[in-house]
Amino acid sequence: MAASINEELERCKDWIEAALEYSGGTHEWSDIVEGIHSLRYQFWPAEKGCAVTEIIMFPNKKIFHVFLAGGEMDQIVDMNDSAAQFAKAQGCDGMSIAGRKGWARVLKNEGWAESFTTLAKEL
């Protein structure tokens, strides 16, 4: 029997909360749960990891954006092809990831490349 979305969220909660530690305070656990339930975010659970994505509409492009990922790195990398297929099916022009620098090295062989650096400053 397939687990419900709530059961999967609870199973993945520690990974999501660990990833939220690097978000700069932009989201809390409750924001993620609400966003997944409202279909604003997409939830990608795996056996030993998970990711949370959103589709962002810019004036000239539609981007599939991975903004949270946690668990075993191999599990996250293994989602690349299915995530790309999903993004294409949604009419996305590209994919982006917000994460720590190590992701650039890990995903290089999957066709990813650094495109810019984001800096942050608390006010």
Locate each region found by the language model.
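Short glycine-aromatic motifs
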Residues: Y41, N109-A113
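Active-site rim helix/loop that mediates acceptor-substrate recognition in acyltransferases
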Residues: L20-Q42
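Short amphipathic alpha-helix that is part of the acyltransferase structural core
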Residues: M1-H27
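Short glycine/proline-enriched coil/turn segments at helix->beta-strand junctions
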Residues: P45-G49, A89-C92, A113-S115
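Conserved catalytic-core motifs of GNAT/GCN5-like acyltransferases
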Residues: A98, A113-L123
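Acyl-donor binding region in acyl/amide transferases
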Residues: K61-E110
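Conserved donor-binding loop and adjoining core beta-sheet/short helix segment
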Residues: H37-D74
